[in-house]
């Protein structure tokens, strides 16, 4: 027979004891820790990592031991463990070995609340919102109950609260491990009953019914149940102490929904045929109206005034991760929700659709392999109405993978049975990059799952706020502002991760404003043109990438032998215009793949000519967006480098040519083109990779080292020119870097030559934003 801890934990006739909690950082266990500390016990706890909750509890007296270790239970009187902790956990095993009494979280909670009039909220879905709402309403009625809810609820202050002066204790009862039967409720609320946690309930719904039935049998006063749920109705409708609620006018408490808004819902409540009044609930959704009706029935039973109930419900704001609005602007909204069961998902999507977004983009993280396996068919029908669905890998929650029960199985099931557009995201760390690059103004992003998927929403919200502020500041609909633009689209080598913020101005004014905006926020800026002579790492570019393109930046004008060109104009365009006006000296530009901006930045060259050989003056912006102009004599230029433009950004330049004739210009142009075609590959490349050493051209050195054709992954040393690395189609930046490093190492070891890269290598090798 199990020991009754009620008297000990409530300090009825006993002194405080030493208690250790295994898994103290979880939302459920942190609440138990808070209650035990309030009761005066000495409490320690361990977990894989600390959280904001553990930091808060430390201030209240918790001894947080950090990661699990056997010695943590030495000298303790009782160990409390969460349902996720099992044999094999070193603290659990040590406590067993020492014979220390051990109880589950639900047993501890039942003991703590045993001296109170307990109100237990049970059901497969909606427990946290309903218990939090009940606590809020009873507070409004000056009953000031103790409470225990399974998530952070800002309006309540904390997830668990002990009030020794109050008779009432409101708690959500967890059914996942059968521990619901530990409670002896005075009032039992049953929201719904469905198949879930089938890793524990091997006999499915039959076994689940038995647990809920026993829970209801132990209720000493009223049972409040939802008649809209067939299983709840089956378990409760014939009980003499049961009160029903729902949308049917035959229910004891029922309602008519008037309006669902983005953050609230209006409905009118009736008791039998009597109108009680109208309520504006501070959270949206039909399912939340049902949760509210359960609380109305409870408060009505406790004799509370309806006006007070309505006021508290209007003031209520939901728990964290329960249709939690992470971000809202005129362009986007991001909603985070804990829903991970098919029924919860359907209800949340229904609520989201009622807000009429232009597109509903859903991100779902399956929770546990066992649930995925047993509910695979139900998941396939849960996402109706979604315009785009992204599915991440399964959040294992400590489970081992099950063959055929992974995220790919859900994706395939959805594709076979629905027309929902679905995409599997295999890398969680870069999931927000994929989603952020997909969404557009007018979209609502709905984040669903019980694991860590909310992190995706938080990262999106962080960066969308910046891009929305930039749009407002620029007030220029022609300037493209996007998140996570894949840089492989903007480099001639066609590799590279995303740009955190991508800005594509077509006017100098917008370019200037963008620089000033990012400068004030201390966000680093890169300016990129056509992306030649550039290798961007796979982790992408943290900060902003500005791509001045089109508009004013593509303008080219001629005055005598002088050509003024914006930085977005291609070198090829300059040569063509020069030829039209019989201006010579630009023929070398014909085969250069870049544009004026990149040429200025790198002092690009060919056929014995460098860019600054022809530059008369440069107009540029500084990092704050101020415009300056300098003569080329005042700008230091070096081989493939112009230091002045490291932290300043060219917007245009004046070039000088010499008088010529079309025939001669055409001849020189063809010679330039022919030479480049014969000596350079046509496959995607960044141009010359290495600077030429003094002793030997880099291409010749690489050829002599027999490294033409050398490859790593999709990156290969060109067979045409040894100083070119080409992308065979699926190269990554790390492939290219590996080839570069192999060449450098061999040159140093075999020839004593230290090669320097001419190509600019920028960005992060790993994901950092």
Language model feature labels by segment:
Residues 3-5, 10-20, 28, 35-39, ...:
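Nucleotide phosphate-binding/pyrophosphate-handling subdomain across enzymes
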Residues 11-16, 35-41, 58, 71-72, ...:
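Phosphate-binding loop of NTP-binding sites
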Residues 119-123, 572-616, 685:
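A gly/ser-rich beta-alpha-beta helix-loop segment of oxidoreductase catalytic cores
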Residues 380-441:
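C-terminal helical cap/extension that packs against the catalytic core
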Residues 470-596:
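Anion-binding (especially nucleotide phosphate/pyrophosphate-binding) glycine-rich loop
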Residues 483, 621-769:
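Phosphate/pyrophosphate- and phosphate-bearing ligand-binding catalytic cores of soluble enzymes
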Residues 496, 503-508, 535-554, 601-632, ...:
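Structural signature of FAD isoalloxazine-binding scaffolds in flavoprotein oxidoreductases
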């Amino acid at each position: 027979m199990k020991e009754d801890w009620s008297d000990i934990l409530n300090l009825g006739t006993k002194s405080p004891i030493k208690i250790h909690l295994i898994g103290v950082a979880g939302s459920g266990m942190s609440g138990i820790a808070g209650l035990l500390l309030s009761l005066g016990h000495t409490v320690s706890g361990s977990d894989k990592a600390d959280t904001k909750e553990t930091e808060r509890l430390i201030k209240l007296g918790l001894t947080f031991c950090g990661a699990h270790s056997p010695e943590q239970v030495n000298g303790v009187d009782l160990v409390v463990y969460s349902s996720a902790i099992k044999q094999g956990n070193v603290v659990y095993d040590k406590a067993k070995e020492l014979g220390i009494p051990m109880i589950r979280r639900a047993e501890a909670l039942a003991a703590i609340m045993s001296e109170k009039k307990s109100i237990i909220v049970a059901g497969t879905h909606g427990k946290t919102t309903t218990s939090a709402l009940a606590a809020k309403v009873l507070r409004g009625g000056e009953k000031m109950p103790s409470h225990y809810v399974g998530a952070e609820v800002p309006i309540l202050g904390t997830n668990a609260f002990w009030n020794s002066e109050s008779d009432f204790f409101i708690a959500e009862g967890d059914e996942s491990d059968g521990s619901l039967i530990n409670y002896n409720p005075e009032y039992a609320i049953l929201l719904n009953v469905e198949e879930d946690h089938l890793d524990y309930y091997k006999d499915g719904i039959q076994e689940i019914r038995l647990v809920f039935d026993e829970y209801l049998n132990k209720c000493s006063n009223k049972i409040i149940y939802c008649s809209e749920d067939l299983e709840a109705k089956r378990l409760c409708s014939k009980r003499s102490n049961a009160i029903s609620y729902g949308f049917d006018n035959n229910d004891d408490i029922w309602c008519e929904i008037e309006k669902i808004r983005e953050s609230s819902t209006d409905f009118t409540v009736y008791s039998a045929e009597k109108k009680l009044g109208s309520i504006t609930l501070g959270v949206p959704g039909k399912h939340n109206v049902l949760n509210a009706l359960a609380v109305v029935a409870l408060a009505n039973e406790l004799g509370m005034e309806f006006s007070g109930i309505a006021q508290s419900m209007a003031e209520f704001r939901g728990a964290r991760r329960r249709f939690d609005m992470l971000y809202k602007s005129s362009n986007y909204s991001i909603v985070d929700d804990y829903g991970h069961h098919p029924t919860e998902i359907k209800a949340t999507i229904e609520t989201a659709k009622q807000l009429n977004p232009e597109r509903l983009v859903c991100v779902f993280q399956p929770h546990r392999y066992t649930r995925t396996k047993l509910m695979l068919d139900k998941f396939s029908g849960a996402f109706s109405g979604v315009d785009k669905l992204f599915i991440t890998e399964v959040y294992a929650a400590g489970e081992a993978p099950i063959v055929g029960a992974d995220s790919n199985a859900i994706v395939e099931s959805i594709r076979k049975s629905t027309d929902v557009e679905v995409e599997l995201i295999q890398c969680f760390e870069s999931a927000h990059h994929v989603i952020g690059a997909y969404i557009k103004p007018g979209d609502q992003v709905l984040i669903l799952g019980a694991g860590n998927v909310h992190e995706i929403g938080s990262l999106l919200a962080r960066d969308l706020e910046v891009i929305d502020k930039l749009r407002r500041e620029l007030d220029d609909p022609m300037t493209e502002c996007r998140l996570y633009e894949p840089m492989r689209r903007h480099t001639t080598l066609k590799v590279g991760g995303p740009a955190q913020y991508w800005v594509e101005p077509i006017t100098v004014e917008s370019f200037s404003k963008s620089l000033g905006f990012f400068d004030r926020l201390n966000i680093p800026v890169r300016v990129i043109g056509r992306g030649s002579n550039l290798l961007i790492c796979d982790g992408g570019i943290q900060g902003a990438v500005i791509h001045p393109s089109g508009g004013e930046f593509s303008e080219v004008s001629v005055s005598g032998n002088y050509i003024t060109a914006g930085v977005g104009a291609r070198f090829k365009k300059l040569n063509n215009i020069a030829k039209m006006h019989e201006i010579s000296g630009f023929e070398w530009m014909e085969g250069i793949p870049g544009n004026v901006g990149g040429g200025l930045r790198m002092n690009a060259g060919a056929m014995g000519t460098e860019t600054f050989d022809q530059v008369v003056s440069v107009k540029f912006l500084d990092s704050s967006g101020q415009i300056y102009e300098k003569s080329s004599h005042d700008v230091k230029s070096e081989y493939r480098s112009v230091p002045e433009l490291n932290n300043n950004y060219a917007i245009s330049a004046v070039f000088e040519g010499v008088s010529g004739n079309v025939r001669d210009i055409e001849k020189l142009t063809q010679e330039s083109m022919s030479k480049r075609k014969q000596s350079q590959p046509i496959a995607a490349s960044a141009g010359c990779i290495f600077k030429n050493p003094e002793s030997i051209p880099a291409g010749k050195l690489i050829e002599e080292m027999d490294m033409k054709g050398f490859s790593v992954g999709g990156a290969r040393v060109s067979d045409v020119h040894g100083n070119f690395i080409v992308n065979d189609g699926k190269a990554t930046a790390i492939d290219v870097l590996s080839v570069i490093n192999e060449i450098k190492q061999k040159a140093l070891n075999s020839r004593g030559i230290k090669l320097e890269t001419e190509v600019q290598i920028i960005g992060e090798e790993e994901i950092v934003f």
